[in-house]
Protein backbone atom coordinates (compact mmCIF):
# COMPACT_ATOMS: atom_id res chain seq x y z
CA UNK A 1 0.00 0.00 0.00
CA UNK A 2 1.48 3.31 -1.05
CA UNK A 3 1.64 5.93 1.66
CA UNK A 4 -0.30 9.07 0.95
CA UNK A 5 1.27 12.51 0.90
CA UNK A 6 -0.90 15.53 1.53
CA UNK A 7 -0.69 19.23 0.87
CA UNK A 8 -1.11 21.47 3.91
CA UNK A 9 -3.99 23.65 2.68
CA UNK A 10 -4.58 25.19 6.11
CA UNK A 11 -1.03 26.58 6.29
CA UNK A 12 -1.33 27.92 2.74
CA UNK A 13 -4.63 29.65 3.51
CA UNK A 14 -3.06 31.19 6.61
CA UNK A 15 -0.10 32.54 4.63
CA UNK A 16 -2.45 34.01 2.03
CA UNK A 17 -4.69 35.45 4.76
CA UNK A 18 -7.66 33.57 3.30
CA UNK A 19 -8.58 31.73 6.50
CA UNK A 20 -11.29 33.48 8.53
CA UNK A 21 -9.58 35.63 11.18
CA UNK A 22 -11.81 34.33 13.97
CA UNK A 23 -10.99 30.70 13.12
CA UNK A 24 -7.26 31.43 12.91
CA UNK A 25 -7.22 33.29 16.23
CA UNK A 26 -9.21 30.57 18.00
CA UNK A 27 -6.84 27.87 16.73
CA UNK A 28 -3.76 29.85 17.75
CA UNK A 29 -5.29 30.58 21.17
CA UNK A 30 -5.93 26.88 21.74
CA UNK A 31 -2.36 26.10 20.69
CA UNK A 32 -1.21 28.58 23.34
CA UNK A 33 -3.56 26.96 25.86
CA UNK A 34 -1.87 23.59 25.30
CA UNK A 35 1.55 25.21 25.74
CA UNK A 36 0.49 26.70 29.05
CA UNK A 37 -0.97 23.40 30.22
CA UNK A 38 2.14 21.44 29.22
CA UNK A 39 4.33 23.97 31.06
CA UNK A 40 2.19 23.71 34.17
CA UNK A 41 2.21 19.92 34.05
CA UNK A 42 5.95 19.50 33.37
CA UNK A 43 7.20 22.10 35.86
CA UNK A 44 4.46 22.05 38.47
CA UNK A 45 4.45 25.84 38.31
CA UNK A 46 1.86 28.33 37.10
CA UNK A 47 2.69 29.63 33.60
CA UNK A 48 1.71 33.21 34.50
CA UNK A 49 5.34 34.39 34.49
CA UNK A 50 6.00 33.24 30.92
CA UNK A 51 6.82 36.05 28.50
CA UNK A 52 6.09 36.44 24.81
CA UNK A 53 9.72 35.48 24.13
CA UNK A 54 9.30 32.24 26.13
CA UNK A 55 6.28 31.39 23.96
CA UNK A 56 7.83 32.43 20.62
CA UNK A 57 5.19 35.12 20.14
CA UNK A 58 5.33 38.86 19.62
CA UNK A 59 3.94 40.98 22.49
CA UNK A 60 0.96 41.96 20.32
CA UNK A 61 0.23 38.32 19.44
CA UNK A 62 0.40 37.26 23.07
CA UNK A 63 -1.92 40.08 24.13
CA UNK A 64 -4.52 39.15 21.49
CA UNK A 65 -4.39 35.43 22.29
CA UNK A 66 -4.48 36.06 26.02
CA UNK A 67 -7.63 38.13 25.54
CA UNK A 68 -9.16 35.30 23.50
CA UNK A 69 -8.44 32.79 26.27
CA UNK A 70 -9.84 35.14 28.91
CA UNK A 71 -13.07 35.61 26.95
CA UNK A 72 -13.47 31.83 26.72
CA UNK A 73 -12.90 31.54 30.48
CA UNK A 74 -9.74 29.46 30.02
CA UNK A 75 -7.36 31.84 31.85
CA UNK A 76 -7.78 34.20 34.77
CA UNK A 77 -8.28 37.90 33.96
CA UNK A 78 -5.02 39.71 33.23
CA UNK A 79 -2.84 36.63 33.71
CA UNK A 80 -1.76 33.41 32.04
CA UNK A 81 -2.95 31.30 34.97
CA UNK A 82 -5.21 28.49 33.78
CA UNK A 83 -8.72 28.07 35.10
CA UNK A 84 -10.18 24.61 35.62
CA UNK A 85 -12.11 25.09 32.37
CA UNK A 86 -8.82 25.88 30.63
CA UNK A 87 -7.18 22.70 31.91
CA UNK A 88 -10.20 20.69 30.81
CA UNK A 89 -10.10 22.18 27.30
CA UNK A 90 -6.35 21.53 27.04
CA UNK A 91 -6.98 17.88 27.95
CA UNK A 92 -9.78 17.66 25.37
CA UNK A 93 -7.38 18.94 22.68
CA UNK A 94 -4.71 16.46 23.77
CA UNK A 95 -7.25 13.62 23.73
CA UNK A 96 -8.45 14.62 20.25
CA UNK A 97 -4.89 14.86 18.92
CA UNK A 98 -3.80 11.45 20.18
CA UNK A 99 -7.01 9.70 19.18
CA UNK A 100 -6.76 11.08 15.67
CA UNK A 101 -3.09 10.11 15.37
CA UNK A 102 -4.04 6.54 16.26
CA UNK A 103 -6.93 6.66 13.79
CA UNK A 104 -4.50 7.72 11.04
CA UNK A 105 -2.07 4.95 12.02
CA UNK A 106 -4.72 2.23 11.93
CA UNK A 107 -7.12 3.38 9.20
CA UNK A 108 -5.24 5.51 6.68
CA UNK A 109 -2.31 5.30 4.31
CA UNK A 110 -0.61 8.43 5.62
CA UNK A 111 3.09 8.21 6.50
CA UNK A 112 3.99 8.39 10.23
CA UNK A 113 5.79 11.69 9.62
CA UNK A 114 2.42 13.24 8.68
CA UNK A 115 0.30 12.02 11.59
CA UNK A 116 1.30 14.80 13.99
CA UNK A 117 0.63 17.65 11.54
CA UNK A 118 -2.72 16.27 10.43
CA UNK A 119 -3.83 15.62 14.01
CA UNK A 120 -2.71 19.10 15.05
CA UNK A 121 -5.11 20.57 12.49
CA UNK A 122 -7.95 18.17 13.28
CA UNK A 123 -7.82 18.44 17.08
CA UNK A 124 -9.49 21.86 16.98
CA UNK A 125 -12.43 20.58 14.94
CA UNK A 126 -13.39 17.30 16.62
CA UNK A 127 -16.45 17.32 18.86
CA UNK A 128 -16.98 15.11 21.89
CA UNK A 129 -19.25 12.93 19.72
CA UNK A 130 -16.36 12.54 17.27
CA UNK A 131 -14.09 11.54 20.17
CA UNK A 132 -16.49 8.83 21.28
CA UNK A 133 -17.05 7.52 17.75
CA UNK A 134 -13.29 7.21 17.12
CA UNK A 135 -12.80 5.66 20.57
CA UNK A 136 -15.36 2.94 19.81
CA UNK A 137 -13.84 2.31 16.38
CA UNK A 138 -10.38 1.87 17.89
CA UNK A 139 -11.55 -0.28 20.79
CA UNK A 140 -11.08 2.17 23.68
CA UNK A 141 -7.32 2.62 23.24
CA UNK A 142 -5.03 3.68 26.09
CA UNK A 143 -2.09 4.94 24.03
CA UNK A 144 -1.47 6.73 20.74
CA UNK A 145 0.88 5.17 18.13
CA UNK A 146 3.94 6.76 19.77
CA UNK A 147 3.13 5.50 23.26
CA UNK A 148 1.64 8.73 24.65
CA UNK A 149 -1.28 8.02 27.03
CA UNK A 150 -4.67 9.13 25.74
CA UNK A 151 -6.63 11.18 28.31
CA UNK A 152 -10.00 9.71 29.20
CA UNK A 153 -13.29 11.44 28.51
CA UNK A 154 -13.42 12.19 32.27
CA UNK A 155 -10.15 14.14 32.04
CA UNK A 156 -7.76 11.62 33.58
CA UNK A 157 -4.33 11.54 31.95
CA UNK A 158 -1.81 8.86 32.98
CA UNK A 159 1.81 9.96 33.22
CA UNK A 160 4.42 8.95 30.68
CA UNK A 161 6.62 6.04 31.79
CA UNK A 162 10.05 6.96 33.10
CA UNK A 163 12.97 6.39 30.77
CA UNK A 164 16.61 5.50 31.07
CA UNK A 165 18.93 8.39 30.30
CA UNK A 166 21.62 8.14 27.63
CA UNK A 167 24.22 7.83 30.40
CA UNK A 168 22.42 4.76 31.80
CA UNK A 169 22.47 2.79 28.53
CA UNK A 170 24.91 -0.11 28.21
CA UNK A 171 26.43 -1.62 25.09
CA UNK A 172 25.30 -5.20 24.47
CA UNK A 173 22.00 -4.71 26.33
CA UNK A 174 18.59 -5.27 24.72
CA UNK A 175 16.10 -2.41 25.16
CA UNK A 176 12.33 -2.15 24.85
CA UNK A 177 10.86 1.02 23.30
CA UNK A 178 7.95 2.30 25.41
CA UNK A 179 7.48 5.66 23.69
CA UNK A 180 8.81 7.75 20.80
CA UNK A 181 8.76 11.54 21.03
CA UNK A 182 7.52 13.02 17.75
CA UNK A 183 7.95 16.72 18.56
CA UNK A 184 11.53 16.79 17.21
CA UNK A 185 10.92 16.20 13.51
CA UNK A 186 14.49 15.22 12.55
CA UNK A 187 14.89 12.66 15.34
CA UNK A 188 11.45 11.22 14.63
CA UNK A 189 12.18 10.92 10.90
CA UNK A 190 15.45 9.05 11.53
CA UNK A 191 13.80 6.63 13.96
CA UNK A 192 10.89 5.95 11.61
CA UNK A 193 13.28 5.33 8.70
CA UNK A 194 15.09 2.77 10.88
CA UNK A 195 11.74 1.06 11.50
CA UNK A 196 11.69 1.78 15.23
CA UNK A 197 8.33 2.23 16.90
CA UNK A 198 6.61 1.65 20.21
CA UNK A 199 7.12 -2.00 21.32
CA UNK A 200 10.32 -2.39 19.28
CA UNK A 201 13.21 -4.38 20.76
CA UNK A 202 16.80 -3.56 19.83
CA UNK A 203 20.31 -4.29 21.06
CA UNK A 204 22.67 -1.37 21.64
CA UNK A 205 25.94 -2.28 19.92
CA UNK A 206 27.85 0.98 20.30
CA UNK A 207 27.17 4.35 21.89
CA UNK A 208 29.35 7.42 21.43
CA UNK A 209 28.80 11.14 21.85
CA UNK A 210 27.95 11.72 18.18
CA UNK A 211 26.99 8.38 16.64
CA UNK A 212 25.58 5.13 17.98
CA UNK A 213 24.84 1.71 16.49
CA UNK A 214 21.94 -0.62 17.23
CA UNK A 215 21.02 -4.14 16.11
CA UNK A 216 17.39 -4.28 15.04
CA UNK A 217 15.48 -6.83 12.95
CA UNK A 218 18.66 -8.43 11.67
CA UNK A 219 20.42 -5.20 10.71
CA UNK A 220 23.13 -3.08 12.31
CA UNK A 221 21.89 0.49 12.01
CA UNK A 222 23.86 3.65 12.74
CA UNK A 223 22.01 6.64 14.17
CA UNK A 224 22.97 10.03 15.56
CA UNK A 225 23.04 9.68 19.34
CA UNK A 226 20.68 12.65 19.68
CA UNK A 227 17.97 10.55 18.00
CA UNK A 228 18.10 8.00 20.83
CA UNK A 229 17.14 10.75 23.28
CA UNK A 230 13.67 10.74 21.67
CA UNK A 231 13.13 7.13 22.84
CA UNK A 232 11.65 6.17 26.19
CA UNK A 233 13.49 2.95 26.99
CA UNK A 234 13.67 0.21 29.60
CA UNK A 235 15.86 -2.91 29.66
CA UNK A 236 14.17 -5.75 27.78
CA UNK A 237 13.49 -8.93 29.71
CA UNK A 238 15.07 -12.14 28.44
CA UNK A 239 11.66 -13.73 27.87
CA UNK A 240 10.64 -10.73 25.72
CA UNK A 241 13.74 -11.08 23.55
CA UNK A 242 13.09 -14.81 23.23
CA UNK A 243 9.37 -14.42 22.46
CA UNK A 244 10.10 -11.84 19.75
CA UNK A 245 12.91 -13.99 18.28
CA UNK A 246 14.97 -10.80 18.29
CA UNK A 247 18.31 -12.63 18.03
CA UNK A 248 17.43 -14.70 14.96
CA UNK A 249 14.84 -12.54 13.17
CA UNK A 250 15.81 -10.78 9.94
CA UNK A 251 13.79 -8.83 7.41
CA UNK A 252 12.42 -10.67 4.38
CA UNK A 253 14.44 -8.34 2.15
CA UNK A 254 17.57 -10.29 3.18
CA UNK A 255 16.26 -13.65 1.93
CA UNK A 256 18.39 -15.04 -0.90
CA UNK A 257 17.09 -17.03 -3.91
CA UNK A 258 16.93 -20.79 -3.45
CA UNK A 259 16.49 -20.60 0.33
CA UNK A 260 13.22 -21.43 2.07
CA UNK A 261 12.61 -19.62 5.34
CA UNK A 262 9.97 -19.58 8.06
CA UNK A 263 8.01 -16.43 8.84
CA UNK A 264 8.31 -15.31 12.47
CA UNK A 265 5.75 -12.51 12.24
CA UNK A 266 5.39 -8.87 11.28
CA UNK A 267 7.41 -5.93 12.54
CA UNK A 268 5.71 -3.80 15.22
CA UNK A 269 6.17 -0.88 12.80
CA UNK A 270 3.66 -2.53 10.43
CA UNK A 271 0.28 -1.11 11.35
CA UNK A 272 -3.28 -0.70 10.18
CA UNK A 273 -4.32 -1.58 6.64
CA UNK A 274 -0.84 -2.78 5.66
CA UNK A 275 -0.69 -5.22 8.57
CA UNK A 276 -4.17 -6.57 7.85
CA UNK A 277 -3.39 -6.97 4.14
CA UNK A 278 -0.15 -8.88 4.72
CA UNK A 279 -1.81 -11.22 7.21
CA UNK A 280 -4.73 -11.82 4.83
CA UNK A 281 -2.22 -12.78 2.12
CA UNK A 282 -0.71 -15.46 4.37
CA UNK A 283 2.35 -13.70 5.79
CA UNK A 284 1.77 -15.10 9.27
CA UNK A 285 3.93 -16.86 11.85
CA UNK A 286 4.89 -20.38 10.80
CA UNK A 287 4.33 -19.99 7.05
CA UNK A 288 7.15 -21.10 4.75
CA UNK A 289 8.38 -18.59 2.19
CA UNK A 290 10.85 -18.49 -0.68
CA UNK A 291 11.65 -16.21 -3.59
CA UNK A 292 9.88 -17.04 -6.83
CA UNK A 293 11.47 -14.39 -9.02
CA UNK A 294 12.91 -10.87 -9.03
CA UNK A 295 11.59 -8.23 -11.40
CA UNK A 296 14.15 -7.00 -13.97
CA UNK A 297 14.94 -3.97 -11.79
CA UNK A 298 14.94 -6.00 -8.56
CA UNK A 299 11.84 -4.37 -7.11
CA UNK A 300 9.23 -5.78 -6.60
CA UNK A 301 10.04 -9.41 -5.80
CA UNK A 302 7.61 -12.32 -6.12
CA UNK A 303 7.49 -14.70 -3.14
CA UNK A 304 5.85 -18.11 -2.80
CA UNK A 305 3.85 -18.30 0.41
CA UNK A 306 1.10 -20.84 1.12
CA UNK A 307 1.22 -22.01 -2.50
CA UNK A 308 0.61 -18.58 -4.02
CA UNK A 309 2.99 -16.20 -5.77
CA UNK A 310 2.72 -12.71 -4.30
CA UNK A 311 4.73 -9.68 -5.41
CA UNK A 312 5.91 -7.26 -2.75
CA UNK A 313 7.83 -4.02 -3.01
CA UNK A 314 10.95 -3.64 -0.90
CA UNK A 315 9.18 -1.23 1.48
CA UNK A 316 6.47 -3.86 2.07
CA UNK A 317 8.78 -6.88 2.40
CA UNK A 318 10.85 -5.18 5.13
CA UNK A 319 7.86 -5.49 7.47
CA UNK A 320 7.98 -9.30 7.31
CA UNK A 321 10.36 -11.00 9.73
CA UNK A 322 11.79 -14.43 8.96
CA UNK A 323 14.01 -16.87 10.82
CA UNK A 324 17.64 -16.33 9.87
CA UNK A 325 18.61 -19.27 7.58
CA UNK A 326 21.33 -21.52 8.97
CA UNK A 327 24.79 -21.60 7.40
CA UNK A 328 24.00 -25.07 6.06
CA UNK A 329 20.91 -23.79 4.26
CA UNK A 330 22.74 -20.81 2.84
CA UNK A 331 25.56 -22.95 1.46
CA UNK A 332 23.29 -25.47 -0.26
Predicted regions located by residue number:
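Mid-protein regulatory/catalytic core that forms ligand/cofactor-binding pockets
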Residues: 124-266, 274
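Basic, amphipathic "hinge/linker" alpha-helix immediately C-terminal to the N-terminal HTH DNA-binding motif
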Residues: 79-97
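Short acidic, hydrophobic short linear motifs in intrinsically disordered regions
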Residues: 42-56, 80, 177
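Short amphipathic alpha-helical interaction segments
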Residues: 56-71, 186-189
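Structural motif
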Residues: 200, 287-288, 308
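Short alpha-helical segments that sit at the start of domains
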Residues: 2-35
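Amphipathic alpha-helical dimerization/coiled-coil segments
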Residues: 99-143
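A short, conserved structural fragment
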Residues: 70-80
Amino acid sequence: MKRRRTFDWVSLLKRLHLLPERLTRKTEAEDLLKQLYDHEKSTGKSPDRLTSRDLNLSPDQLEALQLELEQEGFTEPGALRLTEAGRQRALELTRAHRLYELYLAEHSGYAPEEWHRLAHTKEHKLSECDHERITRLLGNPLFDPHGDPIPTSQGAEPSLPTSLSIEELSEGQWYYVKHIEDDEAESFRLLIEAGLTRDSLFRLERIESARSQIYYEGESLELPTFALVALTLRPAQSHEVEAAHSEEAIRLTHLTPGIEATILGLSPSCRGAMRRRLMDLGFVRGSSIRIDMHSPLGNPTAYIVRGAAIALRHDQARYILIHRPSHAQASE
